[in-house]
């Protein structure tokens, strides 16, 4: 995390991923990059920052304040921006300015969540991505950064396009479940690389 040149060499980002990313970001359009605690999720965010993309990560406060401080200090030292999950106005301003927001969606969320399928079981999940797409026109790109041999490779399912029917609650549920399905497919492909230590499917 402290040697940018080595990091750039070890992360393989296919030309197709770069092409999609640049097309979505053309004209400084905002992007939501959606991922999971799979492989090395921090690495691609750092790659983006080192390549000059305006990236901000949405993070939850860790239970250990010293680790929380150290991890976020590294993120910011490399040039990234960090938002706490409750800083909605700052996140919105970042998107309005054409920034990229990087978030992990495979975690239990109680407040404001929708209960949709995740890996075959109902799970409370944030509908944040669909809400930000609808409000700011942010493009959505699901990605993972997974281990291959001694390095890491970035994969994407391509741009995710939310669908709207006029039923806001139903749209939030359907689009969130679709995103869960995409992340779930990546997790099923690389189950040994999924890091999850708490009850993802607990009751609200």
Language-model-detected regions and their locations in the chain:
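Membrane-anchoring hydrophobic helices of lipid-metabolizing enzymes
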Residues: 1-35, 69-73, 77-79
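Short, flexible loop segments at the rims of nucleotide/cofactor-binding pockets, characterized by
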Residues: 6-12, 60, 77-83, 118-120, ...
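Short acidic/polar alpha-helix capping motifs at helix-coil junctions
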Residues: 7-10, 35-36, 53-56, 93-96
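Short hydrophobic/aromatic-rich motifs at helix boundaries and adjacent loops
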Residues: 16, 41-45, 61-63, 101-103, ...
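Non-catalytic C-terminal accessory region of glycerolipid acyltransferases
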Residues: 19-27, 50, 54, 86-204
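Catalytic core of membrane glycerolipid acyltransferases/transacylases, capturing the structured
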Residues: 29-86, 108-118, 147
């Amino acid at each position: 995390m402290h040697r940018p040149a080595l990091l750039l060499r070890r992360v393989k980002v296919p030309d197709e991923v770069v092409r999609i990313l640049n097309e979505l970001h053309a004209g400084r359009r905002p992007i939501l990059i959606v991922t999971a605690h799979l492989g090395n999720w921090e690495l691609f965010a750092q790659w983006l920052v080192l390549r000059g993309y305006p990236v901000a990560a949405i993070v939850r406060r860790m239970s250990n304040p010293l680790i929380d401080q150290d991890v976020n200090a590294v993120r910011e030292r490399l040039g990234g921006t960090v938002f706490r999950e409750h800083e909605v106005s700052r996140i919105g301003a970042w998107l309005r300015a054409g920034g990229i927001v990087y978030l992990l969606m495979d975690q239990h969320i109680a407040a404001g969540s929708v209960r949709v399928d995740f890996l075959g079981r109902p799970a409370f999940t944030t509908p944040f991505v669909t809400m930000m797409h609808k409000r700011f026109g942010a493009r959505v790109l699901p990605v993972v950064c997974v281990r291959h041999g001694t390095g890491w490779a970035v994969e994407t399912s391509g741009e995710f396009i939310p669908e709207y029917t006029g039923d806001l609650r139903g749209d939030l549920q359907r689009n969130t479940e679709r995103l869960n399905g995409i992340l779930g497919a990546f997790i099923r492909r690389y189950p040994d690389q999924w890091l999850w230590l708490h009850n993802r499917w607990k009751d609200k």
